[in-house]
């Protein structure tokens, strides 16, 4: 049986961090962490599979430096060290990607497994692996042997969350690393969650009012034509399993398995730097908590050295520095998948779907679920010409509508090779050549060498015959089908721009009306706007770049003040405030006065920042809750979830859309307008603040509302009330619009949900150009000294220098080392 805590865990199920300790779902009891489960930091140990001795040193962060005489031995050791630090994460991500969580979690995980079997990441991974070069396959094989050397040596000393779950880990296969890459790619699928949410919202408000709730930048037309695709469809009753699918997708997105992953990266050209040499900055943002999926690694082998960000299970450095080139990645928010509504007819065990006026038999295959505590379950997965019919419930598709997911195929994709080649690129020019071969994942790649900077969009983007892909399209009509993919030479790029800097922060990076469609689900523009402000403010260096990464000033506050002062708003808003009951009127006036004086700095100790964020929360409820509520409804949850992944209706309405039907409060007989709702929101912000922070408004602090909760996604830790897995919550500043990002759920709670998990800066003017930090710890094992040891340095902005020159290794990593020798 699954543990009783599982039902509370599932709403946060699915991310790499969550999967890290999924194995403790068995409900075991855990004592203190066993140091025998931790890789030693020193000594000499034989290891079968090595050709020559390998040295592993660690810095104070726990980051390993692997020194070897051959690249083969370096990869083998990387597999061994990755497993030693993050074996729970690796196993959990693999089972999640395979759709096999119910083997350890029981029946409560079946819905997640059904969805993941439908998505079929194993097929994508197989295509990627088969398309890889023999060289790359050898690398993955050697890495897998290193993982398996750990699994064999520590078979009786695995971390407690793994060992006591009643699960015997299978050995790692080379293809499993391609599966981890496919899972990473799936985690960037912003639009899948949004398309499901759009159907839920359409059920509530109808197709006519749906366009106002879709992610649309202020300078773009609302997508009424896109919403018209749903007109005439009985969405409430005909779409099989929609509520289940949306609920599971929300659970997956809650911890970064669908669309939440964000990031910022930028490069400063020599003419903008104090030294006359380039700088590159990167931070990768994931849901807050223990532990981040990202960790650092450094490898030195003959003809190969690299330091940077890695994900355990994948023998690639995805963002890093090789001594000549620095590269980083951020989420494009690309839309390279589509949902299709399919008309389904069932006759006995035979399922057909409508395609251009004809009923066509659906392809099918069997899936077997080995459920812990139960009998095996065999179910059929059906596929149309667009892809598999998504399913999260035991109910097979019947007559009506079902949803098929179409994704690009990767049969000839060389992305895995390209990432390895990128880590060896000597300059920006070569980085462009290799990154254009990265087609399996949509990224903003930013590069820098000492003299040049560059930006390249990667991925495979479909050419849609009609429609934008914002909403599910009628699958029975071929006019919405894909017509190949955009040529990678058409992908946006830039090199050494006149302005002297390049930046990507999930914003729309292309002008309106660009010749190819990347997305309609862009992130908020404010982080990119703030980068532009600071990059243009003067010459940059390491110190100013650190300050940029920790900057907590939002440009959204200034935009809000502009709206309040606009000629058509200033007087009506004052009149609306004056018309409020006395208590509300006084509160609204106070809020208005303070917000107009607010400097936009969202520090944890700021009273005005607390008021500002209270206003944002209350305005969302005042605008939308009457139509989409209650707050527990699927429609409201869909609105809140979408605001965490893309530019939201909440922001869009505050800054514009004065003619939106949502300004009217449908629960009152009169018709409200925008000034009336803004006045109510101002008053409600103070009222809500009084209830949460007390009546002394000057004593309010944003950090008393907004907290970093350093809790493990490990369900066992939750059963035990925290214990060794968790760390104390701490006050946080910033929000989803600040460079030091700290997003919360807009329309729900104030707890920090997203935070920078790994930061990297490369300043080419320095003797040792690279510095970095992670926000939690290098290890996922609480028995390790490197579990959660980076929280305090992360809070204080204490970066670590990461030396690439051998003469500086001792200063960065010390003298202590673990020596691994060839075993017999």
Curated annotation (Swiss-Prot):
Sample GO molecular function, one term: hydrolase activity, acting on carbon-nitrogen (but not peptide) bonds, in linear amides
Keywords for this protein: Hydrolase, Periplasm, Quorum sensing, Signal, Zymogen
Catalytic-site annotation from UniProt: 264 (nucleophile)
GO biological-process terms attached to the record: antibiotic biosynthetic process; quorum sensing
Family: Belongs to the peptidase S45 family.
UniProt-listed Enzyme Commission number(s): 3.5.1.97
Organism expressing this protein natively: Pseudomonas syringae pv. tomato (strain ATCC BAA-871 / DC3000)
Matching Gene3D superfamilies: 1.10.1400.10, 2.30.120.10, Glutamine Phosphoribosylpyrophosphate, subunit 1, domain 1 (3.60.20.10), Penicillin Amidohydrolase, domain 1 (1.10.439.10)
CDD domains associated with the record: Ntn_PGA_like
SUPFAM superfamilies, A to Z: N-terminal nucleophile aminohydrolases (Ntn hydrolases)
Domain of life: Bacteria
Protein encoded by which gene: quiP
InterPro entries found in the cross-reference section: Ntn_hydrolases_N (IPR029055), Pen/GL7ACA/AHL_acylase (IPR014395), Penicillin_amidase_A-knob (IPR043147), Penicillin_amidase_dom1 (IPR023343), Penicillin_amidase_N_B-knob (IPR043146), S45 (IPR002692)
Role of this protein: Catalyzes the deacylation of acyl-homoserine lactone (AHL or acyl-HSL), releasing homoserine lactone (HSL) and the corresponding fatty acid. Possesses a specificity for the degradation of long-chain acyl-HSLs (side chains of seven or more carbons in length).
Annotated GO CC locations: periplasmic space
Protein name in UniProt: Acyl-homoserine lactone acylase QuiP
Enzyme type, top EC level: hydrolase
Miscellaneous: AHL-mediated signaling mediates quorum sensing in many species of Proteobacteria, regulating hundreds of genes, including many that code for extracellular virulence factors.
Keyword Cell inner membrane tagged: no
Subunit structure: Heterodimer of an alpha subunit and a beta subunit processed from the same precursor.
Pfam families on file: Penicil_amidase
């Amino acid at each position: 049986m699954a543990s009783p805590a599982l039902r509370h865990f599932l709403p946060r199920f699915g991310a790499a961090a969550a999967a890290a300790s999924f194995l403790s779902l068995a409900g075991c009891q855990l004592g203190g962490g066993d140091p025998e489960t931790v890789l030693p930091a020193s000594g000499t140990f034989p290891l079968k599979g090595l050709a020559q001795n390998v040295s592993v040193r660690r810095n104070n962060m726990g980051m390993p430096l692997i020194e070897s005489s051959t690249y083969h031995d370096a990869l083998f050791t990387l597999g061994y060290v990755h497993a030693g630090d993050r074996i729970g994460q690796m196993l959990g991500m693999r089972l999640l990607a395979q759709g096999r969580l119910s083997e350890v979690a029981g029946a409560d995980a079946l819905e997640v497994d059904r969805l993941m079997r439908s998505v079929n990441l194993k097929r994508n991974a197989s295509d990627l692996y088969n398309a890889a070069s023999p060289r790359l396959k050898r690398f993955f094989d050697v890495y897998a042997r290193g993982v398996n050397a750990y699994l064999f040596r520590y078979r009786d000393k695995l971390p407690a969350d793994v060992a006591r779950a009643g699960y015997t880990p299978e050995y790692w296969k080379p293809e499993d690393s391609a599966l981890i890459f496919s899972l990473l790619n799936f985690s960037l699928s912003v639009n899948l969650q949004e398309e499901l949410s759009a159907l839920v919202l359409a059920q509530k408000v109808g197709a006519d009012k749906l366009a106002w709730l879709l992610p649309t930048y202020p300078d773009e037309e609302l997508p009424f034509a896109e919403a018209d695709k749903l007109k005439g469809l009985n969405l409430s009753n005909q779409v099989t399993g929609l509520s289940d699918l949306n609920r599971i997708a929300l659970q997956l997105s809650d911890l970064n398995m669908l669309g939440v992953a964000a990031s910022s990266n930028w490069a400063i050209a020599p003419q903008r730097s104090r030294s006359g040499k380039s700088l590159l900055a990167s931070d990768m943002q994931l849901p807050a908590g223990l532990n981040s999926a990202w960790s650092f690694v450094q490898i030195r082998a003959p003809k190969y050295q690299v330091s940077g960000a890695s994900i355990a299970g994948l023998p690639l450095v995805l963002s890093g520095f090789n001594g000549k080139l620095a590269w980083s990645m951020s989420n494009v928010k690309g839309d390279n998948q589509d949902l299709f509504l399919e008309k389904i007819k069932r006759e006995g065990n035979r399922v057909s779907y409508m395609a251009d006026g004809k009923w066509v038999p659906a392809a099918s295959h069997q899936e077997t679920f080995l459920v812990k505590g139960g009998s095996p379950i065999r179910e059929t997965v059906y596929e149309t010409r667009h892809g598999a019919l998504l399913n999260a419930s035991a109910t097979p598709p019947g007559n009506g509508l079902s949803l098929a997911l179409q994704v690009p195929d990767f049969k000839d994709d060389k992305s895995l090779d390209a990432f390895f080649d990128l880590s060896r690129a000597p300059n920006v020019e070569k980085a462009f050549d290799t990154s254009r071969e990265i087609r399996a994942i949509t990224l903003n790649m930013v590069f820098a060498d000492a003299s040049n900077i560059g930006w390249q969009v990667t991925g495979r983007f479909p050419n849609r015959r009609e429609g934008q892909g914002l909403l599910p399209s009628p699958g029975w009509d071929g006019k919405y089908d894909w017509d190949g993919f955009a040529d990678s030479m058409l992908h946006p790029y830039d090199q050494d721009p006149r302005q002297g800097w390049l930046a990507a922060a999930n914003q729309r990076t292309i002008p309106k009306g660009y010749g190819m469609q990347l997305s309609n689900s862009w992130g908020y523009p404010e982080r990119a706007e703030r980068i532009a402000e600071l990059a243009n403010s003067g010459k940059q260096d390491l110190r100013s770049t650190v300050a940029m990464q920790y900057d907590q000033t939002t440009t959204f506050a200034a935009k809000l003040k502009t709206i309040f002062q606009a000629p058509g708003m200033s007087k009506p808003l004052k009149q609306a405030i004056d018309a409020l009951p006395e208590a509300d009127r006084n509160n609204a006036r106070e809020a208005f006065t303070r917000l107009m004086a607010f400097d936009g700095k969202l520090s944890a100790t700021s009273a005005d920042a607390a008021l500002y964020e209270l206003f944002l929360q209350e305005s969302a409820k005042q605008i939308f809750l009457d139509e989409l509520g209650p707050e527990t409804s699927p429609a409201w949850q869909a609105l809140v979830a979408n605001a965490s992944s893309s530019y939201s209706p909440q922001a869009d309405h505050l800054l514009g859309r004065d003619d939106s039907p949502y300004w009217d409060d449908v629960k009152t007989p009169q018709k409200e307008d925008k000034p009336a709702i803004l006045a109510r929101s101002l008053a409600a912000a103070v009222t809500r603040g009084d209830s949460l922070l007390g009546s002394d408004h000057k004593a309010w602090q944003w950090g008393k509302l907004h907290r970093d909760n350093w809790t493990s996604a490990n369900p066992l830790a939750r059963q035990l009330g925290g214990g060794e897995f968790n760390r104390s919550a701490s006050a946080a500043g910033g929000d989803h619009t600040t460079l030091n990002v700290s997003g919360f759920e807009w329309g729900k709670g104030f707890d920090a949900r997203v935070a920078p998990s790994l930061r990297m800066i490369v300043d080419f003017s320095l003797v040792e150009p690279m510095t970095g930090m992670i926000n939690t710890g290098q290890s996922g094992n609480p028995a390790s000294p490197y579990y959660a040891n980076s929280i305090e340095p992360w809070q204080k902005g204490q970066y670590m220098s990461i030396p690439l020159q051998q003469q500086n290794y001792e200063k960065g990593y010390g003298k202590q080392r673990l020596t691994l020798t060839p075993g017999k």
